[in-house]
Amino acid sequence: MLHVVPLEWTVEEVVPYLERLAVWLRASVLVAFQLTATVALSVLSWWLMPPPVAELCERGRDDDPPSLSHLSLVVPVGCLFLLLRGPSIDRCPRKLPLLLAYCLPHALAFLTLLMCQPSPQAFVGAALLALAVDLSCLGASLLGCDPGASLRRLWLPSVLSLLCATALGLWLLRAAAPFFLGLHATTLLTVTLMLIHDLSLITCQSSFPESFQPSLRLYVENVALFIGMYHLLRLWLWSP
């Protein structure tokens, strides 16, 4: 049947699918870069840490001092203020510094996990959760120049993010005792907003809230959700 169809029509029909494939491959490469840079920055920071500080962390990790948990709030807030005045990924001519800025909050969270309980298991669950959430964040940034196309093409990662947020929300609701009341409430509120946002993307193909840029809004949700996820992972992986 192929010889009956004109070649130009065949190419025109195939090109949109190739463009979509190229977009998702590009997003996958950026996600892989982000995860690799995150783990590398965390491990490098741990190895370069002065011995007295490392001994102090190892000595205090059983007590789980609150100061270590609160460290994961510092860099995300700083990056957020920087990105509030800066361009998004799709408009930034030099994308490497901005991508590294996206990695910093996750690198600090990884480092917090290492400081509290150094173990390779910290990377496994966090990387799996990161893959689902970061696809939404980076996909929206990459396709932010065309909001309509962005929302349509983000259907699959939005479903993955919705499943991830639903599981986290159910875990939070069933938790016997909040690990930290303020963080527990913030994470639960963020998950609720994430659920509303993902349902809006999937059902209505409209963004929520409309006044926020897609990349900035998803970055805020991403950072807040990551903070809660890492703390939950720490409790789940090393609970007695």
UniProtKB/Swiss-Prot annotation:
Membrane topology: Multi-pass membrane protein
Bilayer-crossing regions: 29-49, 64-84, 96-116, 123-143, 153-173, 176-196, 218-238
Residue runs in coiled coils: none
Any one cellular-component term (Gene Ontology): membrane
Keywords linked to the UniProt accession: Host membrane, Late protein, Membrane, Transmembrane, Transmembrane helix
UniProt-annotated location(s): Host membrane
Source superkingdom: Viruses
Oxidoreductase among keywords: no
Family label: Belongs to the cytomegalovirus US12 family.
Descriptive protein name: Transmembrane protein US19
Gene: US19
